[in-house]
């Protein structure tokens, strides 16, 4: 390919020092050299990703100016890498360039970051990223003919602009994913622009690219949120569960070594350090492929692919078969007399090994459920090990595991039952109401997006054999989007509590959330009047958006409304919309208690 070459990982600013250890084995040296091989065309892409993700508001012209600064800097360091400025890490150099561009920090409100140095500055830039990109204009779309003409006129500029638009709308997506997306998009443009049916071709090619980007974004944001809010121990627990389920024959010692590379990868990638992210991900993939015989029989084809394609292939590869003779229980954690002593001697290693053994034996469970069981086990041992007869106590811990799993399973069964009975549209309205009750502070666009994601999760999973793990995993990712990546995101006390108290049990926490009643309630008549005016306002707008806004406003103003009440009102407004006639007897939708609440609210309003 002309611009994005998938034959090796892209690396730039070679003279800059990085924190990863230098390899010593010949095969590792070869891989390291391949990773460090500089491909000049791709310097621009990595720079665009970094600048666009750190300052999403920056214009394309501003990003292009910064890229030129980067290229000049690279050339100076190539010519003389002993210059003091060339000893910086790539990420520090990138942030220096952002801060040094005249007027840019003030214009885009990140000057407070430029007053910091080192880790505090890197963290500040990270916290400055915005997951909700509603402040950006809609993604620019071109007619397929115009798109192809622009691509033929100047393919490099066309692809640079595409990379800029995608990167700033996906500020937490790792650089290797964005590079792969851009490469696939270039392949699509090259192919489709030669076709008669260009629009059909682009649609077919775009679907898997969009799906890959969306899935990667959701998972990476969730894991980075866990790292930022709960620290490296929770991140390690997630990775132990994920890798043990996928590669059940890997030994615990080998897994521990692999996860050292994985943890390093997430630290750099989550922070937005594009160079560290690419290099460390390359190291993880190389580690897996160099030991594939002892890790998995399912990844041989993946390891033969081009480097950027390997990761996606390994992620999507089937789970390896459970080793023969592996029992469903590991006795050392429930039957041994020395459980408490082993826990006390090295708690981190002990519980990591527990997750490893339990996960490889129960690949049917979701990652969140495996973390819940681990938390139950930790709490149970805390109690048992303080008793006179600990062994007699913790022998019954399996009962607690089963109770926890049954609670989670019941939630999934209820959600899939709703999916089967309600249909997609009604189900989305159900979740829209549910999310709005819990978090009325969120903008409508975000609430609609969350409800769509839940419906998509159930649509994907509720007909599968591994329904439970699939739904629980994807539903947890939706909550990860609600909670956000940054520690400084706050919604309301109840939601914040669920998001920040216990990563493993946040889904259970959300399930029991009541409506946030801190919102003020207008009278029923004022509510109906406002909703009717909005409903009948002539706008060039999709009817579905009006329906969504109707429900969101209804619930924001009346958080105590029941399912029957909002459904009744929704039906009445829908029936009246054709002629925008008066809504017939809207008050009849409300129970006496609801009417009373509305009257009390009206009385309160008069007192102000």
UniProtKB/Swiss-Prot annotation:
CDD domains: ALBUMIN. Disulfide bonds join 77-86, 99-114, 113-124, 148-193, 192-201, 224-270, 269-277, 289-303, 302-313, 340-385, 384-393, 416-462, 461-470, 483-499, 498-509, 580-589. It is found in: Secreted. One of its GO terms (biological process) is protein transport within extracellular region. Residues 596-608 have a biased composition (Basic and acidic residues). It comes from the Eukaryota. Detected in brain, especially on brain capillaries (at protein level). Expressed in isolated brain capillaries. One of its GO terms (cellular component) is extracellular space. N-glycosylated; more than 90% of the glycans are sialylated. Residues 1-21 form the signal peptide. Residues 22-210, 211-403, 404-599 form the Albumin domain. One of its GO terms (molecular function) is vitamin E binding. Residues 583-608 are annotated as: Disordered. Glycans are attached at residues 33, 109, 153, 402, 488. Residues 215-319 are annotated as: Binding pocket for hydrophobic ligands. The second albumin domain forms a deep binding pocket that contains palmitoleic acid (in vitro). Palmitoleic acid is most likely not the physiological ligand. Instead, this pocket may accomodate the covalently bound lipid moiety of Wnt family members. Forms a 1:1 complex with Wnt family members; interacts with WNT1, WNT2B, WNT3, WNT5A, WNT7A, WNT7B, WNT8, WNT9A, WNT9B, WNT10A and WNT10B. Interacts with WNT3A. Functions as a carrier for hydrophobic molecules in body fluids. Essential for the solubility and activity of lipidated Wnt family members, including WNT1, WNT2B, WNT3, WNT3A, WNT5A, WNT7A, WNT7B, WNT8, WNT9A, WNT9B, WNT10A and WNT10B. Binds vitamin E. May transport vitamin E in body fluids under conditions where the lipoprotein system is not sufficient. May be involved in the transport of vitamin E across the blood-brain barrier. Belongs to the ALB/AFP/VDB family. This is Afamin. It comes from Mus musculus (Mouse). The gene is Afm.
């Amino acid at each position: 390919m002309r611009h994005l070459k998938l034959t090796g990982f892209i690396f730039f600013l070679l003279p800059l020092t990085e924190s990863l250890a230098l390899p010593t084995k010949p095969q590792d040296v070869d891989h390291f050299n391949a990773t460090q091989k500089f491909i000049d065309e791709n310097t621009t892409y990595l720079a665009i990703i970094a600048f666009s993700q750190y300052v999403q508001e920056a214009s394309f012209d501003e990003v292009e100016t910064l890229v030129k600064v980067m290229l000049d800097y690279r050339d100076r360091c190539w010519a003389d890498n002993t210059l003091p400025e060339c000893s910086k890490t790539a990420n520090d150099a990138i942030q220096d360039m952002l801060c040094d561009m005249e007027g840019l920090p003030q214009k885009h409100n990140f000057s407070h970051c430029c007053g910091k140095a080192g880790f505090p500055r890197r963290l500040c830039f990270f916290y400055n990223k915005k997951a909700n990109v509603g402040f950006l204009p809609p993604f620019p779309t071109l007619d397929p003919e115009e798109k192809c003409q622009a691509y033929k006129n100047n393919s490099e500029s066309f692809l640079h602009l595409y990379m800029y638009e995608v990167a700033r709308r996906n500020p937490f997506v790792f650089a290797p994913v964005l590079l792969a997306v851009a490469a696939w998009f270039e392949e699509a443009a090259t192919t489709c622009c030669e076709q008669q049916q260009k629009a059909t071709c682009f649609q077919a090619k775009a679907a898997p690219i969009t799906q890959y980007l969306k899935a990667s974004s959701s998972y990476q944001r969730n894991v980075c949120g866990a790292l930022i809010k709960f620290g490296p121990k929770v991140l390690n627990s997630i990775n132990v569960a994920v890798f043990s389920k996928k590669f059940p024959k890997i030994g615990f010692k080998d897994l521990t070594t692999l996860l050292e590379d994985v943890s390093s990868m997430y630290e750099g990638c989550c922070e937005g350090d594009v160079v560290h992210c690419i290099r460390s991900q390359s190291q993880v993939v190389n580690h897996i492929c160099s030991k594939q015989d002892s890790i998995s029989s399912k990844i041989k084809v993946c390891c033969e692919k081009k480097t950027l394609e390997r990761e996606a292939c390994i992620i999507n590869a089937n789970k390896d078969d459970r080793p023969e003779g592996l029992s469903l229980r590991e006795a050392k954690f429930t039957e041994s007399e020395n459980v408490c002593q082993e826990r006390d001697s090295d708690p981190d290693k002990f519980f990591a090994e527990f997750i490893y053994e339990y996960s490889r034996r129960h690949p049917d469970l979701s990652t969140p459920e495996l973390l819940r069981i681990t938390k139950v086990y930790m709490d149970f041992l805390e109690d048992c090990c303080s008793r006179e007869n600990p062994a007699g106590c913790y022998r019954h811990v399996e009962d607690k595991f089963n109770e926890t799993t049954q609670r989670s399973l019941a939630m999934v069964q209820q959600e899939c039952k709703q999916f089967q009975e309600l249909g997609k549209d009604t189900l989305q309205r159900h979740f829209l109401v549910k999310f709005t009750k819990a978090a009325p502070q969120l903008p409508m666009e975000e609430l609609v997006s969350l409800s769509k994601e839940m419906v998509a999760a159930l649509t994907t999973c509720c007909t599968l054999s591994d329904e439970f793990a699939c739904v629980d995993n994807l539903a947890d990712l939706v909550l990860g989007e609600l909670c956000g990546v940054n520690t400084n995101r706050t919604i309301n006390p109840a939601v914040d509590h669920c998001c920040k108290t216990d990563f493993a049990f946040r889904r259970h926490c959300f399930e029991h959330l009541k409506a946030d009643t801190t919102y003020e309630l207008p009278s029923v008549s004022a509510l109906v009047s406002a909703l009717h005016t909005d409903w009948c306002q002539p706008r060039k707008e999709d009817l579905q958006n009006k329906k969504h806004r109707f429900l969101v406003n209804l619930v924001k103003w009346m958080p105590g409304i029941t399912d029957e009440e909002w459904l009744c009102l929704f039906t009445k407004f829908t029936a009246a919309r054709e002629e925008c006639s008066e809504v017939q007897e809207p008050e009849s939708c409300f129970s006496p208690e609801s009417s009373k609440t509305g009257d009390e609210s009206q009385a309160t309003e008069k007192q102000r």
